[in-house]
Amino acid sequence: TFYYLQGNHDNGSFVSSLEEIPDNLKMFGREWTSYTISTSGKNVVISGVELDCDNAGSIYSSLSLNVENYNIVVLDGQEASHISKNNAQVISLKDLKNKGIDYLALGHVHEYSMGQLDARGIYCYSGCLEGRGFDEAGEHGFVVLDIDDISGKTETTFIPFARRNVYVAQVDVTGCDSTFDMKKRVEEYLDTAGYARESLVKIELTGS
């Protein structure tokens, strides 16, 4: 089963061309939508809402979760403490605290990061699966949740996935007297840096 929450880049996505939505594709709308996965222990409930300018301020008061479940909440937007580069909706982590959330899955930021939401839950940007430019440097992949359905304890693991990663590296060329010397300095750096053959590396020359 696939759970698909559209973000600000998904207008006119592949779904609009489908004559019929497959049964195993679960989607979200402009109001909270929840899907329950029954287990022998705690139920796992995945809840999400697609944000726009009309509902972005009201989703916090309308979120109601059963604390006996393992609650995954899915949102796409920019966490409020960071400046958004585009028209992404702002997500207030403060207003999602103490709601019974175990795992807050966030989309929009293309870099992996994780933090504590409150005493119970964590939040995570899994990032994009592969860097698309030198502004998305570093390792990319996805996050696996291993949930104990009895205790509700969770282990999270970041899984590198990208076929090739993008890196930005600074090479100090102080003391080089020619472009040949600088080229040699860069080659020496690349020989020892350990980048995979498929990597894309942008070299920034520093020094004097």
Residue ranges: model-predicted function:
Residues 1-146, 153:
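His/Asp/Glu-rich metal-coordinating catalytic cores
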Residues 151-208:
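Accessory, non-catalytic peripheral segments of nucleic-acid enzymes
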